[in-house]
Amino acid sequence: PWTYLGHQRFMQIAKAAGATVRVMPMDLGKVFPISGGLPLGKRAPQRQAYRLVEMARFSKHLNMPMHLKPKFFPVAGDDAARVIIAVDLHHGTQAAMAITGAILKAVWAQERDIADTQVLGELLVEQNLDAACLAQATQADVQERYTQYTQRAIDVGLFGAPTYVIEDEMYWGQDRLDFVARHLQR
């Protein structure tokens, strides 16, 4: 939810700063066990409850529609991550950021199942991208990048999403975007 809540603001901050963005989806299922993170269902009940409070606060504060308990969450995000990588490779970072936003919105605002390749194809078309990216997302080079991005995340000590890294300085969470903006203004 936090990546969804921060995505548009991050794009605006990066654009205003003229920053170069590298989109690097990672497999949180592999990152969490190494970094001590727990999947949502394994967290203590009070943490799960407070997460919903914070989501509602940020959704209202940012005026972003959001289902606190979307129909398709948790959801397997590997195919969606590979689609983002395929779009980045074949259409560039701006297109990858656009499809990322569409995928996040699909889960958190529209209750669409991003584990369904038909839904991913629809999202590509809605972003004026060729649905051929679905086939490209299954190619070995895309999977290799996904694996590399996940390993890189582990190697640099990332432990959650969203994480923004600027000049080797890490900012975790959409609530750190003010710090991201300040760093980019240096």
Specify the residue positions occupied by each region the protein language model found:
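C-terminal cap of thioredoxin/glutaredoxin-like
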Residues: 1-24, 89, 98, 102-186
